[in-house]
């Protein structure tokens, strides 16, 4: 049965509202929609955005001279647990399929932020203002942060490398670049319109982002 010939409304427009688009917020408009299908597509879109869009996150951390997360570092204000929590908040964009390592090497007095992270060009640091730790005069901190692309959530046990170095601290990871999704259905004269409001953890390339959504929805 040809649904279009039967008058069934198939979405023809899926675009971001350019007037409200920022690095951390976007409004996605989908129209036209068959009456009664707005909530169905909205819920499906919300699930896809929160669990199926690929992003990059930290999966492991190695700090020179530290063997486990319950350690402290001489000359550093934060203990290792606090440093891990701060490193988890870092956001990256990776252009590589596999794991990538980025490094930090500083000498105090210094406040370590995302801007201190050195990369090889295949990984972009998006949260350069993210605070990591404060280092006192005379102290030195060297860190290696492992970044990987993925989808959804991965626990630390899954990120732990079998037979890997004992001084690498595995971390749980939230890969999704989307932090929050709400949607609203508007009933127009002959069809429905859905607006999805997205809060993003990091910048997402708009064209690639839309392509990923369409592939998942088969629209």
Label each PLM-derived region with a short phrase.
Residues 1-219:
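Protein-protein interaction/assembly regions in multi-subunit complexes
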């Amino acid at each position: 049965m040809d649904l279009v010939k039967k008058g069934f409304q198939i979405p023809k427009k899926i675009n971001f509202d350019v007037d409200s688009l920022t690095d951390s917020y976007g409004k996605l408009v989908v129209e036209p929609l068959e009456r009664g299908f707005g909530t169905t597509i909205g819920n499906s879109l919300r699930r896809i955005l929160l669990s199926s869009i690929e992003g990059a996150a930290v999966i492991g951390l190695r700090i020179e001279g530290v063997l486990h997360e319950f350690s402290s570092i001489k000359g550093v204000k934060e203990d290792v647990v606090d440093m891990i929590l701060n490193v988890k908040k870092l956001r990256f964009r990776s252009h590589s399929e596999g794991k990538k390592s980025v490094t930090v090497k500083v000498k105090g007095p210094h406040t370590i932020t995302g801007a201190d992270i050195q990369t090889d060009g295949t990984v972009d640091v998006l949260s350069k203002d993210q605070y990591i730790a404060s280092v006192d005069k005379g102290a030195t901190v060297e860190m290696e942060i492992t970044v990987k692309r993925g989808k959804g959530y991965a626990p630390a046990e899954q990120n732990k490398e079998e037979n890997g170095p004992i001084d690498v601290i595995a971390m749980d990871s939230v890969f999704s670049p989307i932090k929050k999704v709400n949607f609203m259905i508007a009933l127009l004269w002959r069809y429905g319109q859905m607006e999805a409001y997205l809060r993003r953890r990091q910048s997402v390339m708009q064209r690639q982002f839309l392509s990923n959504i369409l592939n998942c929805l088969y629209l």
